[in-house]
Amino acid sequence: MAGTLPVPLHVELPQGWESAPPDKVGAPHAAFVGLHKASQGQGFTPNITVTGRTHEGSASLHGLAEESVQRLRENVGSVDIAKRTEVGTSTAPGLVDAPGIVQNLRIQADVNGQPMELAQSQFILLIQNEQQRGELVEIEVALTAKTSQLDAVLGDFQDFLAALRPADPTQEG
């Protein structure tokens, strides 16, 4: 069953991307998955996933980033952290006050029986749940692509992040 987000978010896929049911593309815990249409059928389709979960009290961004890497290691295999940087979210309207962290990862994975080198760029942020006082919401947005595909889709990922914002209560995802 596909995951849900603890807070509603408005997402806009860049041109050339399409949403896909998380369960059908092997991302059952994701609340949202976008696929790069032009790359389908090339052994690996670059994808953007959005997941979320709640935390009572406080949470450390670096701790959350480490947990994400550990989950990947348990589920996929070898993961190396290429870069990790704390960031503000001023480029994402509506999420300006939320602290965030970006980490770029190199992943050695087995995809359809073939060894593959993947790159993943994760943006992890913490926001206050306006509906639940004292509750923090972790949102993880990740772009995953073959290292050879990364340059072609990284700009789209940045556009996706720039458009990400809390949903208007009258809007849907």
What are these regions (language model features)?
Residues 124-132, 140-141, 164:
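Compact, aliphatic and Gly/Pro-tolerant "microcore" segments centered on a short helix or tight beta-hairpin
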Residues 17, 137-173:
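Surface-exposed amphipathic alpha-helical segments
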Residues 1-70:
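Secretory pathway targeting signatures of secreted, lumenal, and periplasmic proteins
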Residues 65-130, 158, 171:
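Signature of long, low-cysteine stretches enriched in small and polar/charged residues
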Residues 44-49, 99-102, 134-142:
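Glycine-rich, often proline-containing surface loops adjacent to acidic residues and nearby aromatics
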Residues 51-55, 71, 140-148:
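Short, solvent-exposed aromatic-acidic interface loops
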Residues 11, 104-109, 141-143:
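Preference for bulky hydrophobic residues occupying beta-strand positions
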Residues 56-59, 112, 148-152:
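A generic structural signal for short coil/turn motifs at secondary-structure boundaries
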